[in-house]
Curated annotation (Swiss-Prot):
It catalyses: Couples ATP hydrolysis with the unwinding of duplex DNA by translocating in the 3'-5' direction; ATP + H2O = ADP + phosphate + H(+). Its EC number is 3.1.-.-, 5.6.2.4. InterPro entries: AddA, DNA_helicase_UvrD-like_C, DNA_helicase_UvrD/REP, P-loop_NTPase, PDDEXK-like_dom_sf, PDDEXK_AddAB-type, Restrct_endonuc-II-like, UvrD-like_ATP-bd. This is ATP-dependent helicase/nuclease subunit A. It comes from Enterococcus faecalis (strain ATCC 700802 / V583). Keywords: ATP-binding, DNA damage, DNA repair, DNA-binding, Exonuclease, Helicase, Hydrolase, Isomerase, Nuclease, Nucleotide-binding. SUPFAM superfamilies: P-loop containing nucleoside triphosphate hydrolases (SSF52540), Restriction endonuclease-like (SSF52980). The gene is addA. It comes from the Bacteria.
């Protein structure tokens, strides 16, 4: 029962709920504190009131999520205690407060890890651990240690030659490496160790694979897969009902009505099978699933209705096809067989993973190392003891339960299961008065990568809300933001977040309530959506190569220019914000603005764009530390000191200011000895006895450097690396040198940080320069860049940080960038997925068929993880929006406005407050799509789009939120930038970025026009590519070469020789001079080859899988979106249904794709009319699209995406003649490389839809 709460004084600033959170007690309490609700203030006040009531500060355990939060908490408590003591008149109470201030430095206010360390230091004897250990805190050191242990253990397993281990390796690795198995074991370890009882978790891994005879009755299907399928089918039936209603009674729409009725009955039958758990019938139905052609409607007045019905039907087709792929790729019997065969692999995974866990633990104990995970497990082992009748509190647990009057936990939503177990043994049992006080906001739980478990918060939220085991207090008032920001956030999340996606209902108790009423209304503070239209981007024109224009390379730059221009507008127009410290309005400054990004990958682009528009920007976590010139130079020098026989580091150091050689001087060193390594050439050059005058100047520098290098190498063997670095800095004056460069203080800070990094490394278990270099290389390899050291923190600059980094902070104006970035669900496409409660789901590689199958646990865990992943994305959006105090901007990009509205209007007709789960659970969606779907139902959206169907749900239609949408294209950005008054330097930067000067081009053309006097030798180059040779067959007249015929014997019959360099004679027109940037056939062909190179041949590729590969290529900027749109994916998929395509899949292990080759051929052998007196060789270079290597033969194939005039015998004959020479060269090169006969040569015409046997010249198959 709760204790009596004192009445809140009239002048008290706290709200009723805050007051309750401060004083309520005698039972466990969960405070659900929304963003900006003052939870830290409440927590501090609660501590102070406890102290005022006579509780000593050291009888409280206060757990924070970060060390910074712990420091802030101590500081705020000290200030409050000092204030209380100063205001107190009673001498006894003043002494009490004074004593609390004295106790504060040693009070238990810390992270849970720090408290665990205290427990272990005190009770280490209970678990027989050496109390003298070192904390293993460096991620890279941890990774290297894991790799060393795993390498040794893996070799041991290989030596044992057990079939089970080889099968495990084969299932998760490929023919190039077993990195897949390494990653699996490391992930296994992380998930196992996050569990309170790792051994129990490991022992239960195979349970999910033991489903019995009735697959439909299994817990996995019933709990995780059936609800998804039923929900999808119910929503599909609703859409068919809408189709029927739309078309009913209209004779000209009767065919559509019948189609909707038939497909609705088919869907209803599907649903009935699932509800009866009849998976066999459901599977058989999906095998017969087909969709008739949609009827054509010619009546103009009915076309809008027909189109509306068609859109509903398209959504249904996608939903049913997706459901089939998700759940019914295998029959129930086949799935049971797969589970049976996959079980031994999971058993071996558990065995190997457990062995690694033990070996890694033994290695850490041997070296007296303890990591954060060990701290938690050791603490749990100290607090709880396992006896015959279960777990009981140990003497340590009893001690702490008696010691602490209250356990206060901040950021409780980020606790994991292991940490929850520790808290359980620290708090008092439920049979007594509760003493656990938890504060957090599950809507801000965004640390799943640290295995945080928000369900722990949610369970208590629901239980305590019903008065079970504790009390729930909700802090809804937001004292941070304007009502404009809060209304917009509430509008969005009332429609997005519920138990299904987000994991908690965004109801009235969760909604944000405006609590700060001091803001003025000096400007429009409505949320703005800034949309960059990619389609509007055209090639940049350069009239007479004199007028520099803005060149936007991709959507990222487009969005950043939109953002930068909006910031310039705010600054230039003196946009007013309310200053809470000054308590008045003032003009905005750069320092008031923050850019929130999903990741750090675009930070360097942000720096470039903002610099070009003269906007100061601070990106302290740019993750470009290793890319800084001064750091790259020093790392190259350290690599050289470790091993001088490294050409690239040697050249880098010689070219750097440390030695100061020029390019031509580097050439002199190479000429001293052309046959050996560059270092040996360097030594030879230094020993040259009679150098030329030029060589003598260089030699003076190189000899001096060689002496320094030898001295540093000697020092590295006997001194610490940090001392070595100081020696180098001092002797080269490099530290002073970089200080004189632009941003000199930052560069010096970077070099200081390298010394700190070296000093930290020397405290690890690794030693020596070689290991340090490996250490640094591993950091670079794993993208664990050293954070760029912060030089200035209070400068007037726009700040950039990730959404994760912004948590707990607030800013007057917030721009959320890259909002249309597609959700990253790549982890769900791996061969394994781990989950805290369900264990592991694997994809099973059938060894004979070499086909990968999704197991039932994989399908179930994939759905669970997808919901969790998208729920966290939704919570990240909540964190991002609630960082804004006064003005919020959301930035994204779409192809054009039509594409944007198409995405947003998918839910325009939904009549429920919360949007359907299927729309929110689209993995290929984005944050902006989510936001857009909530806005189109608001009456404000009608101002921007006439097709908007304003929702009849009153909470949406007339919501008080306000927003504006603005669109920008490249032309508008260009015009806006030209109007800016940029300093000369910035203008020059833009010009340099956008334009090549005319005189530079003309100088290049003049060089290309130079006539070399030895004409005969120039007529044939010594290097030819097969593609260049091939081009001359297309149109010889345009290539300035006579008619050429390549014979079967690989010789070329040419007309009188004009030019024997078989390439185009004209310089290609620069891309920036093009007025239209339509993709060329060559660009489409190159992109198609990229795609074909990456398609997984271990199984029959589907359209969706091929599309996914294409999307990855676009995302990684290997192909442009405009080119992707022109690629014929249907033909690519259809090719794999041909006999040749199936042959590639059947022999996928011996298929070689994109194989480069070089072949030396005598010129007179290739070109008959070549002068006999000239003995020259041609180096033929090419890339073979692919071949199948069989036991005694090879099958060569080549893709072509050329436009084909038809498939008539004459057209086919022309194609065969056009490519015969190229294919003959490929065939010869392949035979020489493999020493095997090439039995077949196939030309695959993807656009023509045929496959040609080049030896017979006949069409052998059709691509349909």
């Amino acid at each position: 029962m709760s204790k009596t709460i004192p009445l809140r004084p009239a002048n008290e600033q706290f709200t009723d709920s805050q007051w309750q959170a401060v004083f309520d007690g005698d039972e466990n309490i969960l405070v659900s504190a929304s963003a900006g609700s003052g939870k830290t203030t409440v927590l501090v006040r609660r501590v102070i009131e406890k102290v005022k009531s006579g509780v000593d500060i050291d009888r409280l355990l206060i757990v924070t999520y970060t060390e910074a939060a712990a420091r802030e908490m101590k500081e705020r408590i000290q200030v409050a205690l000092q204030k209380a003591m100063n205001e107190e008149q009673d001498p006894e109470r003043r002494r009490h407060f004074s004593r609390q201030i004295a106790l504060l430095p040693t009070a238990n206010i810390s992270t849970l890890h720090a408290f665990c360390l205290t427990v272990i230091r005190r009770f280490y004897y209970l678990i027989d651990i050496d109390p003298v250990f070192r904390m293993l805190t460096d991620e890279t050191e941890t990774l290297l240690l894991k790799e060393d242990v795993w390498d040794a253990l893996r070799e041991q397993f290989y030596a044992e030659n057990q079939e089970a281990f080889y099968q495990l390796t084969a299932n998760f690795s490929n023919d190039r490496s077993d990195d897949g198995l390494t990653n699996l074991i490391f992930s296994f370890y992380e998930f196992a160790k996050a569990n309170p009882d790792p051994e129990a978790w490991i022992n239960g891994l195979t349970q999910a694979y033991e489903v019995g005879d009735q697959l439909g009755e299994s817990k996995l299907f019933q709990t995780y897969l059936k609800p998804l399928a039923v929900e999808t089918l119910q929503r599909t039936l609703q859409r068919y009902e809408e189709m029927v209603t739309l078309t009913e009674g209209e004779e000209k729409l009767q065919k559509i009505w019948y189609l909707a009725q038939n497909e609705k009955e088919q869907t209803k039958q599907f649903l009935q099978f699932l509800e009866r758990n009849d998976l066999e019938s459901a599977y058989n139905l999906t095998e017969l699933l087909s969709f008739d052609r949609y009827p054509t409607v010619r009546a103009e007045e009915l076309k809008p209705t027909a189109e509306q019905a068609k859109q509903l039907r398209e959504q249904n087709k996608k939903a049913l096809n997706d459901l089939k792929k998700q759940l019914f790729t295998l029959s129930p019997d086949a799935m049971k067989q797969v589970l049976k065969e996959a079980t031994p692999i999971v058993q071996e995974m558990a065995h190997v993973g457990k062995q690694f866990m033990e070996a890694y633990g033994a290695e850490k104990r041997l070296k007296n190392l303890v990591d954060f995970n060990d701290l938690e497990h050791y603490t749990l082992a100290i607090l709880a003891k396992n006896q015959a009748d279960g777990w009981h509190a140990s003497e340590a647990s009893v001690y702490y339960r008696e010691k602490f009057d209250e356990v206060l936990v901040d950021e409780y939503q980020d606790i994991n299961q292991l940490q929850e177990s520790i808290l359980y043994w620290l708090r008092r049992p439920l049979s007594t008065e509760g003493n656990l006080f938890m504060v957090g906001d599950v809507k801000q739980s965004i640390y799943s990568f640290r295995l945080a478990d928000p369900t722990l918060f949610i369970e208590k939220y629901n239980q305590y809300g019903q008065g079970k085991e504790g009390k729930r207090i909700i802090l809804a008032e937001n004292f941070r933001s304007r009502k404009d920001v809060l209304d917009f956030t509430n509008l969005v999340f009332s429609q997005l977040m519920d138990e299904r996606v987000g994991q908690i209902a965004y109801d009235e108790s969760a909604a944000l309530v405006h609590g700060f009423d001091q803001f003025s209304e000096a400007a429009d503070y409505s949320t703005e959506l800034l949309i960059y239209e990619k389609k509007a981007t055209e090639s940049v024109e350069f009239p007479e190569l004199q007028s520099p224009e803005l060149l936007i390379e991709d959507k990222t730059e487009g969005e950043l220019y939109v953002t930068a221009l909006k910031i310039r507008e705010l600054i230039d127009q003196n946009f007013l914000i309310y200053d809470k410290k000054l308590k008045t309005d003032r003009p905005i400054t750069y320092q008031d603005i923050v850019l929130l990004t999903p990741t750090k990958k675009n930070n360097l682009t942000i720096l470039d764009v903002f610099k070009s528009l003269e906007i100061p920007v601070q990106v302290n976590d740019a993750q470009n530390y290793f890319q800084a010139t001064e750091i790259r130079t020093m790392i190259a020098l350290l690599q050289l000191i470790d091993n001088p026989y490294q050409d690239i580091p040697l050249a880098a150091v010689l070219r750097s200011p440390i030695v100061g050689l020029k390019e031509n001087e580097l050439v002199l060193i190479r000429l001293a000895n052309k046959e050996t390594s560059y270092y040996e050439a360097f030594l030879t050059f230094n020993q040259k006895m009679e150098p030329t005058m030029e060589e003598a100047v260089v030699q003076e520098k190189t000899i001096r450097f060689a002496e320094s290098l030898e001295k540093w190498r000697e020092q590295a063997r006997r001194n610490q690396i940090s001392n070595l670095l100081w020696t180098i800095y001092r002797e080269t004056a490099y530290l002073d040198y970089v200080g004189g460069l632009p941003v000199g203080k930052q560069r010096q800070a970077n070099l200081y940080a390298l010394v700190d990094r070296a000093a930290a490394y020397e405290k690890t278990t690794f030693r020596g320069l070689f290991q340090f270099v490996r250490f640094i290389e591993k950091m670079q390899e794993k993208d664990k860049d050293l954070a760029e050291p912060v030089v200035l923190s209070e400068e007037n600059a726009v700040r950039v940080m990730t959404i994760h980094a912004s948590k707990g902070l607030e800013f007057p104006v917030v721009f959320v960038l890259d909002m249309t970035k597609e959700f990253n669900v790549s982890d769900l496409n791996e061969r394994y997925i781990f989950e805290e409660n369900l264990g592991v789901g694997i994809r099973y590689l059938q060894p004979e068929e070499r086909v990968m199958y999704d197991t039932l646990p994989f399908l179930a865990i994939k759905q669970v993880r997808l919901r969790k992943l998208l729920s966290e994305e939704m919570r990240k959006l909540y964190v991002a929006l609630t960082r804004a105090e006064q003005k919020l901007f959301l930035v994204g990009s779409y192809k054009d406005q039509a594409a944007m509205w198409k995405e947003w209007l998918k839910v325009g007709d939904v009549e429920t407050l919360v949007l359907p789960a299927e729309n929110r659970l689209q993995s290929k969606s984005s944050l902006m799509n989510w936001v857009g779907m909530t806005l189109v139902r608001h009456q404000k959206a009608d101002e921007y789009q006439q097709e908007v169907v304003v929702s009849n749900v009153p909470q949406v239609k007339k919501h008080p939120a306000n927003f504006h949408i603005q669109w920008f294209n490249e032309e508008q950005l260009r015009a806006a930038i030209q109007q800016l008054q940029l300093p000369e330097r910035q203008a020059e930067d833009l010009a340099e970025k956008a334009q090549l000067s005319a005189d530079k081009i003309n100088r290049g053309l003049a060089r290309l026009s130079f006539n070399y006097p030895f004409e005969v030798a120039t007529r044939t180059t010594s290097y030819q590519s097969v593609s260049e040779i091939k081009r001359v067959f297309d149109d010889p007249d345009n290539k300035e070469i006579g008619k050429i015929e390549v014979r079967e014997d690989n010789t070329i019959q040419a007309q009188p020789l004009i030019v024997n360099r078989m390439i185009e004679g004209d310089l290609s027109k620069p891309k920036f001079l093009d007025t239209v940037q339509a993709p060329s056939a060559a660009e489409i062909g190159t992109a198609t080859h990229y795609l074909l190179q990456l398609i997984d041949l271990s199984k029959q590729p589907s359209y969706e899988e091929v599309r996914a590969v294409q999307e990855r290529l676009v995302e990684n900027k290997l192909i442009l979106p405009a080119i992707a749109e022109k690629m014929n994916l249907e033909q690519i998929v259809a090719f794999f249904d041909t006999a040749l395509g199936k042959q590639l899949i059947q022999h996928h292990q011996t298929v070689r794709r994109e194989q480069p080759f070089s072949m030396l051929i005598e010129a007179e052998e290739l070109i008959q009319n070549y002068p006999e007196t000239t003995q020259d060789d041609l180096l033929i270079h090419g890339i073979i699209d692919g071949y199948i290597e069989l036991d005694n033969q090879c099958i060569l194939y080549d893709y072509k995406t050329d436009h084909v005039k038809g498939t008539s015998p004459q057209a086919i004959s022309e194609i065969v003649e056009r490519y015969r020479g190229q294919m003959n060269l490929y065939r010869r090169a392949l035979q020489e490389a493999t020493h095997k006969e090439v039995s077949h040569v196939y030309l695959i015409l993807l656009n023509g839809g045929v496959i040609i046997d080049m030896q017979t010249g006949n069409v052998v198959d059709f691509i349909k």
